[in-house]
Curated annotation (Swiss-Prot):
InterPro entries: F-box-like_dom_sf (IPR036047), F-box_dom (IPR001810), LRR_dom_sf (IPR032675). This is F-box/LRR-repeat protein 8. PROSITE patterns: FBOX. It comes from Homo sapiens (Human). PANTHER family: F-BOX DOMAIN-CONTAINING PROTEIN, PTHR20872. Residues 2-48 form the F-box domain. Substrate-recognition component of the SCF (SKP1-CUL1-F-box protein)-type E3 ubiquitin ligase complex. The keyword Transferase does not apply.
């Protein structure tokens, strides 16, 4: 009698299995010899997402361990408040550090609540170990890692990962511990870096000058998060520095996320006219109307995405209508307050590239769902 997978080529099985969860891949490998061979081939594991919430606990040896060498890009999710999930994530990272030459991309995501006063030293030590071993690492995304990142991690990446193309450190922590000096060392050690995510306090005039250097490879994305007290006290960045950076990298896109910790005077320092802002997220405790109007006047040629969290008002409606009339390149706009019908009409009329929006005319139960444009 023929085995269940005998009639399907291994490459077809691999194409199917690569979309399965870790637990389902393990189950598929037990069906028959053909499926076992396909489930453990490199094509299945090249891009892998692993959740430590349930599927990894107790499963690392021997099945996953045998396939780690095939992983090039890993997205690892875990829940730091649950000890089994956290332990499984750390174990996987430490094993990966011992066999990491082939790793090209690592993305870590925390789920659930982080325990109070948890510095995450055990998790960060595992990340250090991976960075120290993965000399071919090209992409490191720590935006969803809910622990304070520091200079030591950046310097480890600078020393050990010269091939880095992207590094995102702009996570949701309320303490900024990455100084501009370590970022400068990173830029010098990683000449191919083309995407960088930072808290505002980690950026400096010298960094903008380094990015604008004539021998610098094309730089595509700078994501800046302004969410902690250090960001509010950051030194101002002159508009002339942004002019020079934009001239050196005409395709540069900047993403700005402004959180309640930023007072009005700091918002004014951040929103410089020459910044090529492609995405602007405003969640301010003070005036939001002024920044929206500023964006309408200075970012019309570059702004593709806008997110606003503020109290509803006639002034905000008027500012949004002005922005809609000026920013024809907008592809998405999300306002988490009730807006007038004229605001909705303005975005529909003036933004032909709009693909998704959250513009509610009446209060609805949360979460508010966006509308997709056909």
């Amino acid at each position: 009698m023929a085995e269940p997978g005998e009639g399907l080529p291994e490459e077809v099985l691999a194409l199917i299995f690569r979309h399965l969860s870790l637990r389902d891949r393990a189950a598929a490998a037990r069906v028959c010899r053909a499926w076992a061979a396909a489930a453990t081939c490199s094509a299945v594991w090249h891009d892998t997402k692993i959740s430590c919430e349930c599927e990894l606990e107790g499963m690392l040896p021997p099945y996953l361990s045998a396939c780690l060498d095939h992983i090039h890009n890993l997205r690892l999710e875990f829940e730091p408040s649950r000890k089994p999930s956290r332990r499984a994530a750390i174990e996987l990272l430490m094993v990966l550090a011992g066999r990491a030459p082939g790793l090209r991309g690592l993305r870590l995501e925390c789920r659930g609540e982080k325990p109070l006063f948890d510095a995450g030293r055990d998790v960060l030590e595992a990340v250090h170990a991976v960075c120290g071993a993965a000399s071919q690492l090209r992409h490191l995304d720590l935006r969803r890692l809910s622990f304070t990142l520091d200079d030591a991690l950046v310097l480890q990446a600078a020393r050990s990962c010269p091939e880095l193309h992207s590094l995102f450190l702009d996570n949701s922590t309320l303490v900024g511990s990455v100084g501009p000096g370590s970022v400068l060392e990173l830029l010098e050690a990683c000449p191919r870096l083309r995407a960088l995510g930072l808290h505002l306090a980690s950026l400096s005039h010298a960094i903008l000058e380094a990015l604008a250097a004539p021998d610098r490879a094309p730089f595509a994305l700078l994501a800046l998060r302004c969410a902690c007290p250090e960001d509010a006290r950051a030194s101002p960045l002159p508009n002339e520095a942004w002019v020079a950076l934009r001239r050196r990298h005409p395709g540069l896109a900047v993403e700005l996320e402004l959180e309640p910790a930023l007072p009005a005077e700091s918002v004014t320092r951040v929103l410089q006219p020459a910044v090529p802002v492609a995405a602007l997220r405003l969640n301010l405790s003070g005036d939001t109307v002024g920044p929206v109007r500023f964006a309408a006047h200075h970012y019309a040629a570059t702004l593709c995405a806008l997110e606003v969290r503020a109290a509803a008002s006639a002034e905000l409606n008027a500012a949004l209508e002005e922005l809609a009339a000026r920013c024809a390149a907008l592809r998405e706009v999300h306002c988490f307050c009730v807006v007038s019908h004229s605001v909705l009409d303005a975005f529909r009329a003036h933004c032909p590239r709009l693909r998704t929006y959250t513009l509610k005319l009446t209060r609805e139960p949360h979460p508010w769902r966006p509308t997709l444009v056909a």
